[in-house]
Amino acid sequence: MSKKNSYDYVIIGGGSAGSVLGNRLTEDKDKEVLVLEAGRSDYPWDLFIQMPAALMFPSGNRFYDWIYQTEEEPHMGRKVDHARGKVLGGSSSINGMIYQRGNPMDYEGWAEPEGMESWDFAHCLPYFKRLEKTYGATPFDQFRGHHGPIKLKRGPATNPLFKSFFDAGVEAGYHKTKDVNGYRQEGFGPFDSQVHNGRRVSASRAYLHPAMKRKNLTVKTRAFVTKIHFDGNKATGVTFKRNGRYHTVDAGEVILSGGAFNTPQLLQLSGIGDAEFLKSKGIEPRMHLPGVGENFEDHLEVYIQHECKEPVSLQPSLDVKRMPWIGLQWIFARKGAAASNHFEGGAFVRSNNQVAYPNLMFHFLPIAVRYDGQKAPVAHGYQVHVGPMYSNSRGSLKIKSKDPFEKPSIVFNYLSTKEDEQEWVEAIRVARNILAQKAMDPYNGGEISPGPSVQTDEEILDWVRRDGETALHPSCSAKMGPASDPMSVVDPLTMKVHGMENLRVVDASAMPRTTNGNIHAPVLMLAEKAADIIRGKKPLEPQYVDYYKHGVSDENAGAMEFDPYYQH
């Protein structure tokens, strides 16, 4: 390890965004970069990280997960657990490996406020393409990247339950799409996953480890940052605790990449946030930015589970007696049930005709099991994960004290608006309608969860309150926006904290609003784009491409109803 005490850039957090920055910023050989990760290393021999199907094991395990929990959610009457990666790669080392860009119209929404124009889809698309190596796309696909560090597997969704689910979508009046990250997101089809040759493709494995051979990159794990140092409003360095000792390093710039929980926490501890709130915690305000920790978004989801009449599901793979054989197949050949995350297909649909683009995402699984490993009591089963994708419920994060080791108070306010409740009722009814189509008849052995007793709107909402889980997509807690927006925290042109010098934010907290899918891909894109901004490089040229828009494009544009891909 380097013993230098001064760096051009100190990156707080070796997660998704921090891994991208650690790689891109060290492409400038004259810049010294230090990445500080509070968790441990993502060892290549660690099966719970590297084996795709082991994704359920790290959550709730203190060796992999910081194990956050919300306060009692006021509209659910209970606390909600939140897993956050406690290893190099952050949550990309323990997540579900699902790669979803979000809808192009998400980014058009980002760009609506004055000053945010450079974050529209045309400006973001080239950065998505720069990070991707899309094995499921043709070399001439103008929407997808082909040479990036993130290797993406398409589907394959060959289990017959996937085909029946896709066909059920068509019977219910929807369309199939070959690539939900391409021209047409809306519809049913295979998903991309960050799995290559049977192994997880985390941000650290794709970006950070290849860069570690560079002499100008230093990565320190188990390094918990406790303080950012300032000279007036200029960040000058950080203090971190490692192996029981405190260390201080100087920094030309400090970049916060701690994620949607830790970035606003460190900002508040540094005196950046709502001035009155900070004073109440005994912290002298440095910069009054009331948006720090506010505008907090997340996706809530439920599982609709069915018994499967035919022995085609993956339910038997959950049998403890089979696990040694499944593990051996993976260890020696990187094949078998352990070589996939099994989120190989799903859908994006609109729950009503008033929304402009899909507000529901379905993850379909040919197995009935909860994220924590609790399996349904059936020999064979399948399930669909569903939830609203752009709810208008907003939460907040607030520190409890000046102690950097004390976890902050978190409330997402799930189900806090009438619109949110209505979308939830629509989500369950849409999902049930699809799962009741004739295409599912050969397999449909009846609904296990929530079960036939849950029918009315209020019964549905009661079940969601009891059973809903986070989809693990926290974002927007230090959002980008123009200085004219009193709730914005980060300058979208520089990624600097408003009013501060040499202090930037690059992670999910900077998203101005969440996207309509899993957020790992948008975070990688944001970090790629931010790296060029920080380096002072000319940004990649915007790419203005046509994409499917409901009510504007032909209804069948981009649909793949008879594509041979689906003829398993």
UniProtKB/Swiss-Prot annotation:
Top-rank lineage group of the source organism: Bacteria
Gene this protein is translated from: betA
EC number: 1.1.99.1, 1.2.1.8
Family: Belongs to the GMC oxidoreductase family.
Xref: NCBIfam families: betA (TIGR01810), PRK02106.1 (NF002550)
One example of a Gene Ontology biological process annotation: glycine betaine biosynthetic process from choline
Role noted for this protein: Involved in the biosynthesis of the osmoprotectant glycine betaine. Catalyzes the oxidation of choline to betaine aldehyde and betaine aldehyde to glycine betaine at the same rate.
Species per Swiss-Prot/TrEMBL record: Staphylococcus haemolyticus (strain JCSC1435)
Gene Ontology annotations for the cellular component aspect, listed alphabetically: membrane
Protein name: Oxygen-dependent choline dehydrogenase
One Pfam match: GMC_oxred_C
Claim: Flavoprotein is one of the keywords in the record: yes
Binding residue positions for FAD: 8-37
